[in-house]
Amino acid sequence: MELVLKDAQSALTVSETTFGRDFNEALVHQVVVAYAAGARQGTRAQKTRAEITGSGKKPWRQKGTGRARSGSIKSPIWRSGGVTFAARPQDHSQKVNKKMYRGALKSILSELVRQDRLIVVEKFSVEAPKTKLLAQKLKDMALEDVLIITGELDENLFLAARNLHKVDVRDANGIDPVSLIAFDKVVMTADAVKQVEEMLA
């Protein structure tokens, strides 16, 4: 199959298996959920009554005070006491096979092509690391919410995009399923397309 280059009167021949396969919604969902789960820190932690610092002495005698009976200041019922079912640090990551991960990326890229959300260009750059230059270039191309993928990370482009809302710049090795579906449009250079093809082959 061929992808038309927007900034040139030519087309780029690409693999049908990478850019023309059927959309596997279940696979994409599983991989996206796993990717997002892997990004969780999982560092939350609370203390049980056994871990609270303080005396183990009974606050007051069992009977005769008129107050409710109490055996410990660390009781979960008390303010600043322990937590009954205390949260523990945990690893939320899920195992995803390489074949599944690559299959999900291929499904997403193919769907982007079908929905006309993938724009392929010969090259994409700015002369200087100026936000104004990139903003004007995107405006000329009628792009707002966009992920830009280049063969190698262009420092000028990266710096120019840092202060633009809903614009991100990645190199071909830095793509992931969440980023690909998070933006309205994806701009890829011809070099990036070839690199992604090799990576997913």
UniProtKB/Swiss-Prot annotation:
This is Large ribosomal subunit protein uL4. It comes from the Bacteria. One of the primary rRNA binding proteins, this protein initially binds near the 5'-end of the 23S rRNA. It is important during the early stages of 50S assembly. It makes multiple contacts with different domains of the 23S rRNA in the assembled 50S subunit and ribosome. One of its GO terms (biological process) is translation. Pfam families: Ribosomal_L4. Residues 46-71 are annotated as: Disordered. GO terms for molecular function: rRNA binding; structural constituent of ribosome. The gene is rplD. Part of the 50S ribosomal subunit.
